[in-house]
UniProtKB/Swiss-Prot annotation:
Cofactor(s) listed: Fe(2+)
Protein's name according to its UniProt entry: tRNA N6-adenosine threonylcarbamoyltransferase
Residues that hold Fe cation according to the record: H111, H115, D305
Annotated residues for binding of substrate: L134, V135, S136, G137, G138, D167, G180, N277
Annotated HAMAP family: TsaD
Biological process according to GO: tRNA threonylcarbamoyladenosine modification
Disulfide bonds, paired cysteine numbers: none
Reaction catalyzed: L-threonylcarbamoyladenylate + adenosine(37) in tRNA = N(6)-L-threonylcarbamoyladenosine(37) in tRNA + AMP + H(+)
Localization annotation: Cytoplasm
EC identifiers of the protein: 2.3.1.234
Organism: Ralstonia pickettii (strain 12J)
Keywords: Acyltransferase, Cytoplasm, Iron, Metal-binding, Transferase, tRNA processing
Entry GO CC: cytoplasm
Gene Ontology terms for molecular function: iron ion binding; N(6)-L-threonylcarbamoyladenine synthase activity
Amino acid sequence: MLVLGIESSCDETGVALYDTHSGLRAHALYSQIAMHREYGGVVPELASRDHIRRVIPLLEEVLGKAGATRADIDAIAYTKGPGLAGALLVGASVANALAFALGKPLVAVHHLEGHLLSPLLEADRPEFPFLALLVSGGHTQLMRVDAVGQYTLLGETLDDAAGEAFDKTAKLLGLGYPGGPAVSRLAEFGNPGVFDLPRPMLHSGNFDFSFAGLKTAVLTQVRKLNLTDSETCYQPRADLARAFVDAIVEVLVKKTLRAAREHGLKRIVVAGGVGANRQLREGLNAEGKKRGLRVYYPDLQFCTDNGAMIAFAGAMRLQADPAQVQDGYGYGVTPRWDLEDIRIRHA
């Protein structure tokens, strides 16, 4: 079965073809980072317009790479939500039009499910059940995953997501857009232990997160030491970035390992843009190894939004239960969507 996947939830336009027999056939991605950089963040209207410009050329590129035609497509998957409403509508419109014209099944995919299942694209893939840490610009969640469509929320952020905290800290430190990678790069040159930042909710007794207080602590230090001059204050800013990354990684690592232990899970999946962070990967790998846990990640190119994860998630849903996941034709999108709402009833 050859499944076309279309991703357009925010500022990346992604298209891919996934074959349930041979794996990922082809994928293409266009990032809008350069366009949004001058505004310091994503401008929804500009994002939507750019998706319109890019999606069809990307579709043709992917078909060419795969040596396939539109007639070869067996099903079409698209991101229905969560995300920016206008951006989602672009992908939904193209997917619906293609599915209707070709008479093919249409699968609405939850964006976070795409991230959650993306490590299964790798040759060394985890078996169910596993614990998933979803860390991105808009979400920070711990999920128990028993099968495709069987997700149990164990904990989530009560305010800022981890990626959002990275982006806001980048602005406080006068770094560029996108902020997450900029903070991580600066932190590489920082000295540990110079600043003592809080570890919010580290000992809360549950698996929820909170990063707003950590961001405020960074702001306090920036104002106290007047760290706004990127030229004369380089080392103190690097030290503060290091303290921020150390704090956020410690919270993510310890809560994830605690959740795995308490739920008897030996496999951990890390997905989402923050999952590309080197410090987070090293921390989870080292501490997980001590406890006999395996930690799995998607390829770095699939940590951020992409069409491959949507094509794959759509294919997995169709295989799990075609009758229940087929979406019919319609242009509705769901900008706010709970992952637990998409459960598949397994026999």
